[in-house]
Amino acid sequence: MNVYEAMATQRAVRRLRPDPIPVPVIERIFQAAAWAPTGGNVQPFRMVAVTDRDKLATLGALYSKQWDSYTSGMRAEGEQLAIPRRKMMEAGDYLCQHFHTLPLVVVFCFNANHMAITDADLDRPSVVGGGSVYTAVQNLMLAARAEGVGCVLTTLLCFEESAVKDLLEIPDPWGTCAHIPMGYPVLGGYGPTSRRPVSKMLYQNTWQTPADFG
């Protein structure tokens, strides 16, 4: 599978089987994450691979609490909820119910002290630091796609960071920024993604000027 096919079919896969992922596959996926570019090549991230059943159950309980809060508005819409959002919610419910059976959850950690955060003083939320972590997250997810392993990027456990850090013995000043459930898909899992056309996302030279490379 080439990288373009992997990117074009990288759906969020929340319905995951408990079957173990072979060690060579896991090693290739984590190697891909470690290859990611980071600011100054400092690599200010670490990954905690969670496989312990008790820890997975605890993470699942924490995640389910936040998922219920996140989806409360959608549930209130009942039959009026749009079908794509209903499907997403149902898949998320499945993930919550089976979190303790997952073969692997990857917790991405970062150390802001090792980042050159060039937008820290701007009058808006800072995002530059994430550029030295989420590149690794995307590499990991693309590698998982290439290996046929399902996964989904989640961040709700950031609301439970203190409990997660205690559970996994993550020291200060490290924080968490992504939690990736992984496993082989229950159903087809991957397939063509649905996104805005690039013509709606790309400008040339000035804002809202349509790009024309002809």
Predicted regions and their residues:
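C-terminal helix-cap and adjacent tail motif
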Residues: E5-A6, V13, C177-G214
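A short N-terminal beta-strand-loop micro-motif at the entrance of redox/enzyme domains
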Residues: V13-R28
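Short catalytic-loop micro-motif centered on adjacent basic/acidic residues
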Residues: R15-L16, R46, G150-T154
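Small-aliphatic-rich amphipathic alpha-helix that forms the alpha element of a beta-alpha
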Residues: R28-I29, A33, V106-F108, A112-L167
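Glycine-rich phosphate/pyrophosphate-binding beta-alpha loops
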Residues: A34-N41
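Short connector loops at helix/strand junctions that flank enzyme active sites
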Residues: V42-P44, F99-P103, G175
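Glycine/small-residue-rich phosphate/adenosyl-binding loop
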Residues: A49-V133
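A glycine-rich helix N-cap at a beta->alpha junction
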Residues: D68-G78, L167-P192
